[in-house]
């Protein structure tokens, strides 16, 4: 099985928010100014890129989706440069021009890949009549699959609550990248995407993952949100939804050069994926992968479909990710040539919980590579009953593949993975629970090949069945 990209070409997204122009001056520096203790930069390259809400729209358009952008600008060279840059990448702009204000511009001076200073040219748009923005939203609602409200606290979203209500009445999901600590103004949004510092500024410092979940769920209830996605830098992302287990996704970034605009990339990919008809869990998976790409670039950047595809599929080239059985056999053969010990386990992994994560981490410590074989939906139904699985196969595999402990994820259709194990022949076969080694499917084949079979204990108190029962009781209550 392969993870396929969303059909971005059928996705329509409108972005409304604070648009700005990012200017970059690049050059070498080799001396200190005689006028003051500051470096002298000899500027040899000047770049201009859309920033803020405009960068969100750029990220959406770069995926091949239909992006529309609404915001406030002045009537100046910066507005014209912004419009031209966006038109060049197929973003449809419908700006409201405010003659009394300049277009927000941020100038960054860089040398040797280091940002030395940033200069801001702006006056807030507070007090500007929001009606033209509302009219543009109303005109687009019938032809878009998601509305993004990109808030940089510059005034374009002064009437954000009215915008939310317009979209929700039309059945269009509203995604918001929030600013400040007044989350009351975002009441009723479909999804908020604060980073960890923004989240903690509202709910207080969180020392544990459990505190993030507890306070995040309270925030969802307090402000009538459908979901909350907390982006946590090197710790990845946490998706919280009422009635569902938390989804924690580790970062996929390999190198971090610049986090400028990473939040814009996340919400842009989320919106485009949802507008293409994918689930919120899938949207988070793709957004997490995209964030891992964009922080490896310098300055405000976007992610192309090819880069995103390489991020989610290309892990197979380096020995990671969701694979077909044939791809897995090739990856295992390559691992053996490198002298790596291959560990294999299997299960349904319907609602991933702390017990699963702990078990998989312990299994991974026993070797160099960990394979997780997952029951298909039909296999799960035969094993667990008609009400299972709760999460379909592709979503279960995506979540498992995002775990740091897991190298390869593969599915099987049969009641047991015996045939699959016989074809892979891992060096170590691991199963959780109270099995006897000889009872484990595939054990005979592994032993016959000189391998080992081991039973690991699950963490006490963790059970998918118990989680489902608790959710059902909470709904009744």
Curated annotation (Swiss-Prot):
The lineage of its organism: Bacteria, Pseudomonadati, Pseudomonadota, Gammaproteobacteria, Enterobacterales. Homodimer. Pathway: Nucleotide-sugar biosynthesis; ADP-L-glycero-beta-D-manno-heptose biosynthesis; ADP-L-glycero-beta-D-manno-heptose from D-glycero-beta-D-manno-heptose 7-phosphate: step 1/4; Nucleotide-sugar biosynthesis; ADP-L-glycero-beta-D-manno-heptose biosynthesis; ADP-L-glycero-beta-D-manno-heptose from D-glycero-beta-D-manno-heptose 7-phosphate: step 3/4; Bacterial outer membrane biogenesis; LPS core biosynthesis. NCBIfam families: cyt_tran_rel (TIGR00125), PRK11316.1 (NF008454), rfaE_dom_I (TIGR02198), rfaE_dom_II (TIGR02199). Its EC number is 2.7.1.167, 2.7.7.70. One of its GO terms (cellular component) is cytosol. This is Bifunctional protein HldE. Residues 344-477 are annotated as: Cytidylyltransferase. It catalyses: D-glycero-beta-D-manno-heptose 7-phosphate + ATP = D-glycero-beta-D-manno-heptose 1,7-bisphosphate + ADP + H(+); D-glycero-beta-D-manno-heptose 1-phosphate + ATP + H(+) = ADP-D-glycero-beta-D-manno-heptose + diphosphate. It comes from the Bacteria. Gene3D superfamilies: 3.40.1190.20, HUPs. In the N-terminal section; belongs to the carbohydrate kinase PfkB family. It comes from Escherichia coli O6:H1 (strain CFT073 / ATCC 700928 / UPEC). The gene is hldE. Residues 1-318 are annotated as: Ribokinase.
């Amino acid at each position: 099985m392969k993870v396929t990209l969303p059909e971005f070409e059928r996705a329509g997204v409108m972005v409304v928010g604070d648009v700005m122009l990012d200017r970059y001056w690049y050059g070498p520096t080799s001396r200190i100014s005689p006028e003051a203790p500051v470096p002298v930069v000899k500027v040899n390259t000047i770049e201009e890129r859309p920033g803020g809400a405009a960068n969100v729209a750029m990220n959406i358009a770069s995926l091949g989706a239909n992006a529309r952008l609404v915001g406030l600008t002045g009537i100046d060279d910066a507005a014209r440069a912004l419009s031209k840059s966006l038109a060049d990448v197929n973003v449809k702009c419908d700006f409201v021009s405010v003659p009394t204000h300049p277009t927000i511009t941020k100038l960054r001076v860089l040398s040797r890949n280091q940002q030395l200073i940033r200069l801001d040219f702006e006056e807030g748009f507070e007090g500007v009549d929001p009606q033209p923005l509302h009219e543009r939203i109303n005109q687009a609602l019938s032809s878009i699959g998601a509305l993004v409200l990109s808030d940089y606290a510059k005034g374009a979203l002064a009437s954000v609550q009215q915008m939310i209500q317009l979209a929700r009445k039309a059945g269009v999901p509203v995604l918001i990248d929030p600013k400040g600590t007044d989350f009351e103004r975002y009441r009723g949004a479909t999804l908020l995407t604060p980073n960890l510092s923004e989240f903690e500024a509202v709910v207080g410092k969180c020392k544990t993952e459990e505190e993030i979940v507890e306070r995040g769920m309270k925030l969802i209830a307090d402000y009538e949100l459908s979901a909350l996605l907390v982006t946590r830098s090197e710790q990845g992302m946490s998706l919280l939804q009422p009635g569902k287990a938390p989804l924690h996704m580790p970062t996929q970034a390999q190198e971090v050069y610049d986090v400028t605009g990473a939040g814009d990339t996340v919400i842009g990919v989320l919106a485009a994926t949802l507008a293409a008809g994918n689930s919120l869990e899938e949207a988070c998976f793709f957004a997490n992968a995209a964030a891992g790409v964009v922080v490896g670039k310098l300055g405000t950047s976007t992610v192309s479909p090819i880069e995103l595809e390489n991020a989610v599929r290309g892990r197979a080239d380096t020995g990671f990710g969701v694979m077909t059985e044939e791809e897995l056999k090739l990856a295992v053969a390559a691992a053996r040539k490198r002298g790596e010990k291959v560990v294999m386990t299997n299960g349904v992994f319907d609602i991933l919980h702390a017990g699963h994560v702990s078990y998989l981490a312990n299994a991974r410590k026993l070797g160099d590579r960990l394979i997780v074989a997952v029951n298909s939906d039909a296999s799960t139904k035969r094993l667990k009953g008609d009400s299972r699985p709760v999460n379909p196969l592709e979503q279960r595999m995506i979540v498992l593949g995002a775990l740091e402990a897991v190298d390869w994820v593969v599915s099987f259709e049969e009641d047991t993975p015996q045939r699959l194990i016989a074809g892979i022949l891992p060096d170590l076969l691991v199963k959780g629970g109270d099995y006897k080694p000889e009872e484990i499917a595939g054990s005979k084949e592994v032993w016959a090949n000189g391998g080992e079979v081991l039973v690991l204990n699950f963490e006490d108190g963790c059970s998918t069945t118990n989680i489902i029962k608790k959710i059902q009781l909470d709904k009744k209550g």
